[in-house]
Design a protein with these regions (language model features):
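N-terminal glycine-rich phosphate-binding loop and ensuing alpha1 helix
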Residues: 1-49
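Acidic metal-phosphate-binding loop of nucleotide-sugar-dependent transferases
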Residues: 72, 99-101
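Short aromatic/hydrophobic "clamp" motif used to bind/position activated sugar donors
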Residues: 92-94
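Conserved donor-nucleotide/metal-binding helix-loop-beta segment in metal-dependent transferases, i.e.
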Residues: 103-119
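Conserved N-terminal catalytic core of the sugar/cofactor nucleotidyltransferase
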Residues: 30-90
Length: 119
């Protein structure tokens, strides 16, 4: 199983609440999730959040959301927490929450390369 995990911290230092900033009429992170879900080689996309405020803001969207600790120092730490909670995965892709225009073909290409026997 190939899983994309999107770490989404609400209170980033440089731009607090960036993930909830409206873009195309919805929170930025929603655009990121929707684009990630278009990747054909991902079996699952998980949004890893750290606050009830984010959870409430996204309640109308049908996404796979996992609440994580607020005490992580990095998105990688947040992803590691999620990985411990989920089923086994062949490939984990770290997709940044502030990449609302990510091209799903890039995700697919990365997975193809990682699945290649020559890797």
């Amino acid at each position: 199983m190939n899983i994309g995990i999107i770490p989404a911290r609400l209170n980033s230092k440089r731009f607090p609440k960036k993930i909830l900033t409206p873009l195309n009429g919805k929170p930025m992170v929603v655009n990121t999730v929707e684009r990630s879900l278009m990747a054909k080689n991902l079996d699952r996309v998980i949004l890893a959040i750290d606050s009830e405020e984010t959870k409430k803001a996204l309640k109308d969207f049908d996404f796979d959301i996992v609440m994580t600790s607020k005490n992580h120092n990095s998105g990688t730490d947040r992803i590691a927490e999620v990985v411990q909670k989920i089923e086994e995965a062949n490939i984990i892709i770290n997709i940044q929450g502030d990449e609302p225009m990510i091209d799903p073909k890039i995700i697919d290409s990365l997975i193809n390369k990682l699945e290649s026997p020559s890797v």
